[in-house]
Amino acid sequence: MKQLYWYTCGEGDCDLVLLHGWGLNSGVWHCIIDRLAPHFRLHLVDLPGYGRSQDYGAMSLADMAERVAQQAPKQALWLGWSMGGLVASQIALSQPECVRGLITVSSSPCFTARDEWPGIKPEVLAGFQHQLSDDFHRTVERFLALQTLGTESSRQDARLLKSVVLQHQMPDVEVLTGGLEILRTADLRTALSGFTLPFMRVYGHLDSLVPRKVASLLDSAWPQTQSVVMQGAAHAPFISHPNDFAKLILNFAEENKK
């Protein structure tokens, strides 16, 4: 079996697995490692087809979750950002023995706008999929720029995201298209409605990809979960507000100690 890139560090006794979003790799977490490493055993994963896990083609959400779970510690906290939030959520649903708590960041159980549900317009995602084959690098750059739009440090944060992408070979177009297909089609709203493990959802107030209205809708639909909307943050709050973000994670872990 081909191994995913899986880097473990930290001095704590609580396992925390971090899953990156579309187009990126585990390098995106380096800005908060120093803040979390004293408290956790961190597991930084390159999802199949991304970063240093290049030996994979496009995968479905279920297959990606199954593959990641195969290398995972038991009873870990899982933190998934954006598309990584879908992967972490799918693992929590299908491999609950791996999970003691779930944190999703700037993520949605359904990224696509539907009747009375806010999200990305289907034609926008379809447009990104089409543009990948025409102008691969520019399409990825446009998507990264959307993630930091509106924050005080928008340009600086976008440059950081771009540098993370360029650290390693770019994912294949097939992998990126498959990731957009996951964002376009996945809908875990019903499946997660009965989820009973500790679950925190973190949002950016200025996020243009996951509207903050998602937070209030899920507060009503999933009253057993908790949500935090970070003021001044967009789609990557751990980059624009690393100290506040790290405190949220530490508090969640402390409140849900076993």
Curated annotation (Swiss-Prot):
It catalyses: 6-carboxyhexanoyl-[ACP] methyl ester + H2O = 6-carboxyhexanoyl-[ACP] + methanol + H(+). Residues 16-242 form the AB hydrolase-1 domain. The keyword Nucleotide-binding does not apply. Keywords: Biotin biosynthesis, Cytoplasm, Hydrolase, Serine esterase. One of its GO terms (cellular component) is cytoplasm. The keyword Acyltransferase does not apply. Belongs to the AB hydrolase superfamily. Carboxylesterase BioH family. Monomer. The physiological role of BioH is to remove the methyl group introduced by BioC when the pimeloyl moiety is complete. It allows to synthesize pimeloyl-ACP via the fatty acid synthetic pathway through the hydrolysis of the ester bonds of pimeloyl-ACP esters. This is Pimeloyl-[acyl-carrier protein] methyl ester esterase.
